[in-house]
């Protein structure tokens, strides 16, 4: 028996080709995308503007399948974390409500291969890339849950950030089509400024990205010099800070989504990267790059070798950068009581890399495949 095609793996253009191959009019794809994403429908029989003959044909060859929720946890601050089942493993997706928006933090891989030393996900190792349906399916599943609770005042998703488990630019082949669906007016219709891709700095993939899609960009920098970044963000040994910042500036030069500015993410690690001297170094690194800087309180996880920067050290770091004219925001920690805060996502990962502590030191050995 031929395996059914999961229509969530297709962009609208790909679905139009799929319908042509079925001998049907391409506009049927527009209808189906609306049913799936506007109305959260995964049952062909409920698609009333599609005739029964076509519905029966679709049921024979296709399915609409998103990850199922295995566990839901709710924080006192309104944050919701879902562990979603993908095969025999789990990924994590986080809903973060705020006064004027609601952001969904989406995973791109089962685990992560980059081995950043301050991140819980990295300690789980890496298993595989998520498919398009497993990425966009996180948005679909979360929207469906929130829709069911809409009467209680839970805010619909307004923003999506590719900041969950994994490095998005090591899964370009699936992340970009998923983001296309986030932007597609027939699907979720989010503004390109409300879809953010966060990367630790896979420079060749970032250089290619501008020709594929225009979305908001966030850079996980976390250190102001190569010596320190080599240690805590090992991919820096392959693509150093200068290479990364040059690539960022190239992306900004052709992007409309970023308003000419990139977001720089900087986790505050006590007496590691949070001194006044580090702040001066960071200002020098970013002096020719229009940006806003997010200072992120570090969120602890078991066996981590770090401490959280004191409020005093964070304040001094922020003020030093602001004296240079930078916009600097100290991110409010959300969902830390359910381990849903930045750097705490772990999921349930079968590590295929079998990395040792020694291997983790060699970021230059990270295999970067551009797809």
From Swiss-Prot:
Keyword Iron: yes
Pfam families on file: Radical_SAM (PF04055), RlmN_N (PF21016)
UniProt: S-adenosyl-L-methionine binding residues: 166-167, 198, 220-222, 299
Entry's localization field: Cytoplasm
Residue intervals of the Radical SAM core domain: 98-337
Catalysed reactions listed for this entry: adenosine(2503) in 23S rRNA + 2 reduced [2Fe-2S]-[ferredoxin] + 2 S-adenosyl-L-methionine = 2-methyladenosine(2503) in 23S rRNA + 5'-deoxyadenosine + L-methionine + 2 oxidized [2Fe-2S]-[ferredoxin] + S-adenosyl-L-homocysteine; adenosine(37) in tRNA + 2 reduced [2Fe-2S]-[ferredoxin] + 2 S-adenosyl-L-methionine = 2-methyladenosine(37) in tRNA + 5'-deoxyadenosine + L-methionine + 2 oxidized [2Fe-2S]-[ferredoxin] + S-adenosyl-L-homocysteine
Cysteines paired by S-S bonds: 105-342
Location of the active site: 92 (proton acceptor), 342 (s-methylcysteine intermediate)
CDD domains recorded: Radical_SAM (cd01335)
The keyword 4Fe-4S appears for this protein: yes
Annotated [4Fe-4S] cluster binding sites: 112, 116, 119
Enzyme Commission number: 2.1.1.192
Gene3D superfamilies, per database record: 1.10.150.530, Aldolase class I
UniProt record similarity statement: Belongs to the radical SAM superfamily. RlmN family.
Note: Reaction proceeds by a ping-pong mechanism involving intermediate methylation of a conserved cysteine residue.
Function: Specifically methylates position 2 of adenine 2503 in 23S rRNA and position 2 of adenine 37 in tRNAs. m2A2503 modification seems to play a crucial role in the proofreading step occurring at the peptidyl transferase center and thus would serve to optimize ribosomal fidelity.
Protein name: Dual-specificity RNA methyltransferase RlmN
Gene: rlmN
